[in-house]
Amino acid sequence: MISKFGSVHILAVVAIQLLIIPSVSSLNLTNAYLHHKCNNTEGKYSHGSAFEKYINLALRAIDSDNYLNGFAYIERGEDPNKVFVMYQCRGDSYGSKCKSCISAAISGLRRRCPKSKGAVIWYDQCLFEISTINSFNKIDYENDFYLSNPNDVNDKELFNKETSALLEELTNKATDKNNMIGNKFVLYAAGDKRIGTKNVYAMVQCTKDLVTTTSAACFEWIFKMFSKCCEGKQGGRVLGTSCNFRYELYPFLRN
């Protein structure tokens, strides 16, 4: 798979494993590391500092969560050492599966971005972010990347048209104001569609701090990258910290 992060194009060797997963059951167990970014402009904290104290308080709050909502946005501390921590799990990953992914993400981020005040990491089933900036209900236009299958489909024109239509249909469902659990917007939808001789499986998701209007704007933004990452490809995804989409020719979600 070819990966793009920011304005840099690289070959993401780790993403090759996404092409060779042999079964739905193994897909359900996959939690591959995808990407990370250390936001150096936010600086670093020192051992024993107030910022480290507040990060640890935020992480303890996350650790005590039941992960049933699959999302949390936590604020700890006071200026100038205020910490904002967010996690979100994929729409089919919650409870113990969500917790397992977030634990891996926290460990991975600490290893890859030691003592960074701002950093984000993506795994196959979750994302985790630490920041000094309050981004609640705000779209992050800075941090995104894409992964695509190197193999092409046969009828590219038909495939692009119908896959785009499926993603648009799922977006409308995800951003429907009636798509709620309790008093919270779901902002997630998944489905499949027969295109020619193939079944296409897809999902769209936004972080649950967004409202439906903000999430619709986020989806519109990432769908503009479809032509760069995915046209004519057998699989592809665009991931940001605020929203993402994915489609494949095989099932990749739990029922």
Swiss-Prot record:
Compartments where located: Secreted
Primary localization: secreted
Domain annotation Gnk2-homologous: ranges: 33-135, 141-252
InterPro entries registered for this protein in UniProt: CRR_secretory_protein, GNK2, GNK2_sf
Cross-referenced PROSITE patterns: GNK2
Record flagged with keyword Secreted: yes
Record Pfam families: Stress-antifung
The keyword Secreted appears for this protein: yes
Keywords, comma-separated and alphabetical: Repeat, Secreted, Signal
Signal peptide: 1-26
GO cellular component, one term: extracellular region
Disulfide bonding pattern of the chain: none
Entry's family note: Belongs to the cysteine-rich repeat secretory protein family.
Protein name: Putative cysteine-rich repeat secretory protein 27
Organism, scientific name: Arabidopsis thaliana (Mouse-ear cress)
Taxonomy of the source species: Eukaryota, Viridiplantae, Streptophyta, Embryophyta, Tracheophyta
